[in-house]
Structure formats: C-alpha cells, structure tokens
Swiss-Prot record:
Record's protein name: GPI mannosyltransferase 1
Purpose of the protein: Mannosyltransferase involved in glycosylphosphatidylinositol-anchor biosynthesis. Transfers the first alpha-1,4-mannose to GlcN-acyl-PI during GPI precursor assembly. Required for cell wall integrity.
Any one of the GO BP annotations: cell wall organization
Keyword annotations from UniProtKB, A to Z: Cell wall biogenesis/degradation, Endoplasmic reticulum, Glycosyltransferase, GPI-anchor biosynthesis, Membrane, Transferase, Transmembrane, Transmembrane helix
Source species of the chain: Emericella nidulans (strain FGSC A4 / ATCC 38163 / CBS 112.46 / NRRL 194 / M139) (Aspergillus nidulans)
Main location: endoplasmic reticulum
Signal peptide: none
Keyword Glycosyltransferase among UniProt keywords: yes
Pathway: Glycolipid biosynthesis; glycosylphosphatidylinositol-anchor biosynthesis
Length: 443
C-alpha cells in the first residue's frame, strides 16, 4: 500500500477507474431496476439544459434552484449523440479527480509535505467511495470542490485577486461559500501584520489618545482595514455582482427568486437528515391544509429563523475563535457547523466538508488517537444508517415514520455531528500560531 502513493498515476488512475465503473454500473441499474441510480437532481439539471437549448429559461423547469451557468455547462446532455446524456455525470466525476489533484498540490506547496505524503492524505477524497458515488449519480458538488480548494490555495499563496474572483464565483454558484469570507479576512491579519507592520504603525492614532478605550477601539478598527482585505472584499463583491447582473439581465426576477430568495423559506423534508426535517414536514402539511385560509403565523417565519444559530456559529463564532490558528481547519469547522445546523441536510452536503479532511487529518486527534478516529467514523456512519433505515420504511414501504422514528434518528445524527464538531474545534484551537504558520509556509 505504501508503494501505491509513490506512483501518482496509479492513485489518479484508481480514482478515475472507480468513477468510470460507477458510471457504467449506474447506467445498468437505471435500465434494469425500479430504484434508479441517477439522482433526481440530475434530471432537474438536464431538463433545465433542454429548456435552454430550446431558447427558453432554465427556470421553466420546476424545482430548478441553481445558477443558469450549470444548465449552460450541461448543454451537451441535450445533443442527440449516444451516451451524451451522461456528460454531466462524467464532468462532475472528473471535477472530483481534479479537486483531489488540487488538494495534493496544495498540501505539497503550502503545507511543505512530500508528494507521497500529500497524495496519501488526498486519497481520503480521491478514493472515497461516498464521494465517487455522489458525483456519478449526478451531483454537481465536485465543481464546488474545485472552486473551494482553488480558493484556499490562492489565499494561502497570497493570490488575493484570484482568491477574490474564486470567492465571488463560488458564492454565485452555490451561496454557502460566502461563509469563508469572514475566516479569510480574519486570517489575513496575521500575514498583514508581519508584512506591512510599517503601514499599520502609520495608521495609529496619536499617542495621547491611543491608550483611551475609544482610542484602542479606533486603533483596532484601523489595523483591521488593510490593503489585502480591501482588495479581497472588493474583487469578490464585484465578481459576484457582475455574474448576478448578467444572469438577471438575461432571465429577470425568476433568476433571483429561484437561485437565492427561495432558500430563505425553503421547505424540504424529503431525504433530509436535519432535525428540522420533521418540523418542515409539519409546516408543509399545515400549508397544504390551509387552502383558502390564512397560512401565516409562527410557522411562516420558522424557515427564516432557522438560519440564526447556523450563521451565528459558522460565520461569526468559529472564524473569530479559530481564524488565526489555521485557515483550512477553520474552513472545515465552518462548513461542518453550517451543514450540521442547516435546516436541510442531504448526503451531497457532506462533500462540502469532506474536501477539507486531507488538510485537517495530519494534525488531528483522529489519527493521533486511533480509538477516537474509529469512534468518530463509526458513529457518523451509524447515525446515517439509522436514519436511512427509517427513510426506507417511509419511501419504499409507505410506513409513516416521521414520528418518532425519523425525528429521533435525526436528533441522534445531529448529536453525533455536534460532538464531532467539538473535536474539530478543539483540534484546530489547540494549534499555536507558530506551528500553523510553519505548516503553511511555501517552499
């Protein structure tokens, strides 16, 4: 096994081969089984592409809640060429492999690892059957993996302009990467202090005033406003606004409604691991039963209020506590918290944080303490298995298992994830700045 990682072409070949096998198996299962391998989201993507190919809006397809860019990218699925319907799956699978390659390169260039060791950790993504399964079923998360790892690499290498563009594209493509903005801005402080100390000193308030509470506060504000932070903020905002303006001019209000505003009041209780799922189910049921009546009330604001604890933890608390310790670890903790506390949590969302595992594992307690690592993996898988068992009763046997089965399973999985989040935060918080900076040093 050790010799495997000395041959990168073998690792990448295995990663590509695994996905190729799954693509062919998926085509066979779709043709011979009532239970389809292809994810329903892929059908939504390709239907939207078909509408675009006919000169219509992708939002003519019900439940298409994504940027038009995705429908444009999958236009080859509409071509009358045998096998091209799976073009999108192949693209997503290839993106998986590219994301893994970027992870390995980042570990080598910014973390000072040997190519062999970096590839070993990158294989937690490249050779992960769950990652391969999700992409070959037609989930587009691999594209986000490429964008997020490229963003991380750009920031760690001080490519501020590139980082700003990638952040803007990522947020346009799938909203959630906006959470990384805070941690990146906070992390840049350490670098800015060491490289632009003279500039910081030139912005200090007058000596007689700086020791007062107001003076200290003003000094802290001024020291936070640095050229790097300004450039990153402006470029990411300009990129995001430019993409949205172009899409709005082309598709109008439906673009804003379906791509962004829909998520504020989204009610999605199917295939949802979140403990909110049962409440969403009850909300959906009450809304359906309120035909001809006022459907307002507490349930009407529930979907929006669910964002408060999620955003407070992932956007404010974690970046401020961990941001200066280790950027990849902070981004992992942010993403894990965002997914755990999200009102909608599906298997695809797990890929959002799994992409950071290769950066986290080298210094994590999960490897230093194998028992802890095994317990984390076992409970995480068991939590999903219990939920899926209840979901099977509901989806395939027609047994109403929302209460108490699915609700208790969701609470159990949430508790497991909250515990794992605590482990991650403790690990990243335990790093000292010197070791973190040394680990990120470019050779």
């Amino acid at each position: 096994m050790e010799s495997l990682f000395k041959r990168p072409f073998m690792v990448y070949g295995l990663a590509a081969g695994l996905r190729t096998v799954l693509l062919f198996y998926g085509a066979w299962q779709d043709a011979h089984s009532a239970v389809k391998y292809t994810d329903i989201d892929y059908m939504v993507f390709t239907d939207a592409s078909r509408y675009v190919s006919q000169g219509d809006s992708p939002y003519a397809r019900d439940t298409y809640r994504y940027t038009p860019l995705l429908a444009w990218m999958l236009l080859p699925t509409t071509w009358a060429i045998p096998g091209f319907f799976s073009f999108g799956k192949a693209l997503f699978a290839l993106s998986d492999v590219v994301a893994g390659w970027l992870v390995a390169k980042s570990l080598t260039l910014t973390h000072g690892m040997s190519a062999e060791r970096a590839l070993k950790y990158a294989s937690f993504w490249l050779l992960n059957p769950m990652v391969a399964n999700i992409s070959t079923r037609g989930s587009s998360e691999g594209l986000l993996g490429v964008l997020v790892v490229a963003l991380l690499w750009a920031v760690l290498n001080r490519r501020i302009y590139l980082g700003g563009v990638l952040l803007g594209i990522g947020v346009h493509f799938k909203i959630y990467p906006f959470i990384y903005g805070m941690s990146i801005l906070w992390w840049l402080d350490e670098k800015e202090f060491t490289t632009n100390k003279a500039q910081s000193e030139s912005r200090e308030v007058k000596p007689k005033f700086k020791d007062t509470p107001v003076g200290i506060f003003i000094s802290q504000i001024l020291s936070f406003i640095t050229p790097c932070r300004i450039r990153l903020t402006l470029i990411s905002l300009l990129t995001f606004v430019a993409l949205n303006a172009a899409m709005y001019l082309h598709y109008g209000t439906p673009f804003l409604q379906h791509t962004y505003l829909h998520h504020l009041t989204r009610i999605d209780h199917r295939h949802n691991f979140s403990p909110y799922s049962t409440l969403l189910y009850l909300t959906a049921a009450s809304s359906a039963g309120a035909v001809g009546h006022d459907a307002g009330g507490p349930s009407g604001s529930f979907e929006s209020l669910a964002f408060i604890p999620q955003l407070l933890i992932s956007v404010v608390v974690i970046p401020l506590v961990l941001g200066k310790k280790d950027l990849p670890g902070t981004m992992l903790a942010q993403t894990f918290a965002f997914v755990t506390f999200n009102k909608v949590c599906t298997s695809q969302y797990f890929l959002w944080y799994l992409i950071f595992l290769p950066f986290y594992l080298p210094t994590s307690s999960l490897l230093r303490n194998p028992r802890l690592g095994i317990a984390v993996a076992a409970l995480w898988i068991l939590g999903q298995a219990l939920w899926l068992q209840q979901g099977y009763l509901l989806e395939f046997l027609g047994i109403s298992s929302f209460l108490p089965g699915l609700f208790l399973a969701s609470l159990g999985f949430f508790a497991v994830n909250a515990w794992i989040l605590g482990v991650i935060v403790a690990d990243v918080g335990g790093l000292n700045l010197e070791s973190g900076n040394e680990k990120r040093r470019v050779k």
